[in-house]
């Protein structure tokens, strides 16, 4: 049983997957997408879901700091519905407030260059989101 964690942006989709026991999240990759065109990398997601035998998907849900739902959170809701329809798997929207900032902080602490951070930040945000979800289940 593995869980897939996703961090949706307008141009990229950060992807992480849990270990088989559901204890730890590992970053897999960042998929290039085009939200305006409705291109979400579903073919690649299908390959990842099949390869890792995923049974649940967790999508970052970026609420505003006051708990309200803004445009990015609405985009995540639409994306979650698309995933449920496409893959027939349970999709959980997970509060991801500050996940990108936490990922950025970890990369800075690890002395990762700005250029490299830009390349991996979405994947790391997906790891933060998924790990938060997994920790809540322990």
Swiss-Prot record:
Enzyme superclass (EC): hydrolase
EC number: 3.1.-.-
Matches recorded under Gene3D superfamilies: YqgF/RNase H-like domain
Top-rank taxon: Bacteria
Pfam families recorded: RuvX (PF03652)
Keywords, ordered alphabetically: Cytoplasm, Hydrolase, Nuclease, Ribosome biogenesis
Segments traversing the membrane: none
InterPro entries in UniProt: RNaseH-like_sf, YqgF, YqgF/RNaseH-like_dom, YqgF/RNaseH-like_dom_sf
Nuclease listed as a keyword: yes
Statement: the UniProt record of this protein carries the keyword DNA damage: no
Subcellular localization, as worded in the UniProt entry: Cytoplasm
GO biological processes: rRNA 5'-end processing
One Gene Ontology MF term: nuclease activity
GO CC list: cytosol
NCBIfam families: RNAse_H_YqgF (TIGR00250)
Family of the protein in this entry: Belongs to the YqgF nuclease family.
HAMAP family: Nuclease_YqgF (MF_00651)
Biological role stated in the UniProt entry: Could be a nuclease involved in processing of the 5'-end of pre-16S rRNA.
Name recorded for this polypeptide: Putative pre-16S rRNA nuclease
Species for this entry: Geobacillus sp. (strain WCH70)
């Amino acid at each position: 049983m593995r869980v897939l964690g996703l961090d949706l942006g307008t141009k990229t989709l950060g992807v992480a997957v849990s270990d088989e026991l559901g204890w730890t999240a590992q970053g897999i990759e960042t998929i290039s997408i085009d939200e305006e065109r409705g291109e979400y990398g579903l073919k690649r997601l299908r390959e990842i879901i099949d390869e890792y035998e995923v049974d649940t998907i967790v999508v970052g849900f970026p609420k505003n700091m006051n708990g309200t739902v803004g445009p990015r959170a609405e985009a995540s809701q639409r994306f979650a519905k698309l995933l449920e329809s496409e893959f027939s798997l349970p999709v959980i929207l997970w509060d991801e407030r500050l996940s990108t900032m936490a990922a950025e902080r970890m990369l800075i602490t690890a002395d990762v260059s700005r250029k490299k951070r830009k390349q991996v930040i979405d994947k790391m945000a997906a790891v933060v989101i998924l790990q938060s979800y997994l920790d809540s289940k322990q």
